């Protein structure tokens, strides 16, 4: 009995840590997020690494956007080709022919309530390939809850955010976009873990509209960090700090 009490005391102290609070919030996304699709384009592999980190923390399907013309080197000659594609979009942003062709999308976007965009930054703008996807699917994406993660070398992401808002005027933004650059790319797991609770994703459970604020109320959690069922024993967390056994 003494050993059991010591074990439970140690467990309670662990649950009081800020890291555990963040993980509890993230676990609630896994349990309560509505059906989610991660849409990404990755030229150098950085965005793919970000998607892998994101997918390890939430339950979501993935859709990789690919250019129709293969083998192009967008970075050659100081991104001359990439700049050319971006300039064509700038000149006529409402003309479908201004956007580079992409492979057909076979996923049914109608099946998803949450969309998470993961895109590279080219010369302070959204990569042209991702712009094509958003332009072509702006009607299907209308009414969705959308979040975004931007990969860049060092530039700020405000230009990419502006492109996204122009291309998707009728979506609900879940929150601020997350920028991940060369200096913090290796810390992407923790960056994403801290970012997720700041997003107001569409929930499959009507009783929970915002996981972050809900966690701060008195709730009973199992040892796995999920909400306990009625009558199920677990750990009571109140105001994110006070803990008891029920």
Identify what each model region corresponds to.
Residues 1-25:
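Bacterial Sec-dependent N-terminal signal peptides
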Residues 17-18, 202-224:
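Residue-level detector of functionally pivotal "anchor" positions at catalytic/ligand-binding pockets or at interdomain
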Residues 22-117, 126, 193, 197:
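N-terminal beta1-alpha1-beta2 submodule of the flavodoxin-like/Rossmannoid cofactor-binding fold
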Residues 235-246:
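C-terminal tail/sorting-segment detector
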Residues 80-170:
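Helix-loop-strand module that forms the ligand-binding subsite of alpha/beta enzymes
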Residues 172-205:
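Glycine-rich phosphate/pyrophosphate-binding loop and the adjoining helix
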Residues 43-46, 67-71, 121-125, 152-156, ...:
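Solvent-exposed loop/turn segments at secondary-structure junctions
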């Amino acid at each position: 009995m003494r050993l059991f009490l010591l074990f439970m005391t140690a467990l309670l102290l662990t649950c009081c840590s800020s890291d555990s609070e963040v993980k509890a919030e993230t676990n609630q996304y896994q349990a309560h997020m509505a059906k989610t699709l991660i849409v990404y384009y990755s030229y150098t592999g950085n965005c793919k690494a970000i998607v892998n980190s994101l997918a390890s923390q939430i339950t979501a399907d993935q859709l990789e956007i690919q250019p129709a013309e293969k083998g192009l080197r967008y970075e050659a000659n100081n991104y001359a080709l990439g700049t050319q594609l971006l300039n064509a979009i700038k000149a006529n942003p409402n003309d479908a022919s201004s956007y580079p062709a992409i492979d057909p999308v076979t996923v049914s976007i109608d099946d998803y309530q949450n969309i998470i965009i993961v895109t590279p930054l080219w010369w302070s703008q959204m990569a042209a390939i991702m712009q094509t996807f958003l332009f072509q699917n702006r009607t299907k994406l209308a009414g969705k809850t959308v979040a975004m993660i931007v990969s860049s070398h060092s530039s700020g992401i405000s230009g990419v955010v502006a492109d996204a808002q122009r291309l998707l005027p009728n979506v609900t933004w879940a929150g601020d976009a997350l920028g991940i650059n060369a200096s913090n790319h290796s810390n992407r797991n923790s960056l994403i873990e801290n970012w997720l609770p700041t997003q107001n994703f569409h929930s499959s459970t009507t009783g929970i509209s915002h996981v972050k604020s809900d966690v701060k109320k008195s709730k009973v959690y199992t040892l796995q960090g999920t909400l306990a069922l009625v009558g199920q024993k677990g750990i009571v967390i109140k105001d994110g700090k006070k803990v008891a056994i029920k």
